[in-house]
């Protein structure tokens, strides 16, 4: 019967000399199999050893140490014995996201994926954020998260330098992993556009614009028609941010939407017969185009039209990985301020 004392587990072992040479890098590894990792004490001890081995493995990888492969094998061996106390790797979470929002479906200009760290990162806590900023990295470290999942890629354009203040540098320094799901999550079922439609209470949603064979924008109907100004206020109140809007001069019933920077879909929204179009940000000529076409256009902010996906994503992943704690970042906010 093991006895615990803080982070140590004591038990009685009977060993005999066998003259077999033991790998002195990790003495006692053969005894790991004798530990009952299904017991609360054994599981807690095994998790501590996994974290310790993961730190060692990370250092070995940085130094290109040939022993890194053996250490990773040891990590996976211990993890495989923890029935009922599953160990989750970052790669498994990446694969789960890839199932419902395939990374290969991202737009050509995009850079989603596992951008910092390793698939073999052991994950107990995950932070979810729209952007990976220095503040978010510091929050992840303080709250014990080893993986950050963001919507916007932490590395988007090619880097010519990597200063210490860059979030990717900070993540590597703290041995964190980053998975970024951008336009693949925008267009996925249950992704940004779906969540935006739900936030606005739209019904009977269907695609109105396509990127290859994927829905780039959705079209739905309001339960109750509204005037253009009332609809703009409705969007503001539903999404919680300031809005710019063009008065289309007619009652709004059918609404097109695209989260983020969707102003390029203005023409298609008109062609689809929408009374209004909701997106995050638009250009001046797109405002003029909407005005000329009698389309009420509401630019509700990039941040506000995309943050709607964060909590549903957290819930979805928490259901898939109940042993992992998923939490939304608290230090990220809309960088754009509105003065009424």
Could you describe each region identified by the protein language model?
Residues 86-340:
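Hydrophobic structural segments
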Residues 1-86:
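Class I S-adenosyl-L-methionine
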């Amino acid at each position: 019967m093991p006895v615990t004392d803080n982070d140590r587990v004591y038990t009685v072992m009977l060993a005999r000399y066998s003259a077999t040479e033991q790998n002195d890098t990790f003495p006692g590894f053969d005894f790991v199999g004798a530990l009952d990792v299904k017991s609360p004490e054994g599981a807690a001890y095994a998790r501590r050893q996994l974290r310790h081995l993961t730190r060692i493995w990370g250092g070995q990888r940085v130094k290109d140490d040939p022993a890194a492969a053996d250490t990773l094998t040891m990590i996976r061996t211990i993890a495989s014995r923890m029935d009922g106390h599953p160990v989750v790797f970052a790669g498994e979470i990446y694969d789960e996201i890839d199932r419902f929002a395939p990374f290969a479906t991202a737009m050509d200009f995009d850079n989603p994926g596992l951008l910092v760290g390793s698939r073999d990162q052991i994950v107990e806590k995950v932070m979810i954020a729209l952007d990976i900023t220095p503040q978010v990295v510091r929050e992840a470290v303080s709250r014990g998260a080893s993986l950050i999942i963001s919507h916007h890629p932490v590395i988007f354009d090619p880097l010519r330098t990597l200063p210490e203040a860059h979030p990717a540098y900070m993540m590597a320094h703290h041995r964190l992993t980053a998975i970024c799901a951008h336009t693949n999550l925008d267009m996925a079922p249950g992704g940004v556009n779906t969540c935006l439609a739900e936030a606005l209470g739209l019904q009977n949603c269907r695609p109105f614009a396509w990127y290859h064979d994927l829905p780039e924008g959705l079209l739905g109907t309001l339960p109750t028609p509204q005037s253009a100004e009332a609809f703009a206020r409705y969007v503001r109140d539903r999404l919680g941010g300031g809005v710019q809007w063009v008065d289309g001069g007619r009652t709004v019933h059918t609404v097109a939407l695209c989260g983020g920077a969707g102003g390029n879909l203005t023409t298609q929204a008109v062609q689809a017969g929408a009374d209004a179009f909701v997106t995050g940000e638009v250009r001046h000529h797109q405002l003029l185009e909407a005005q000329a076409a009698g389309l009420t256009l509401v630019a509700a902010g990039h941040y506000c039209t995309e943050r709607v996906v964060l909590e549903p994503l957290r819930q979805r992943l928490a259901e898939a990985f109940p042993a992992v704690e998923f939490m939304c970042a608290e230090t990220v906010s809309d960088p754009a301020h509105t003065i009424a």
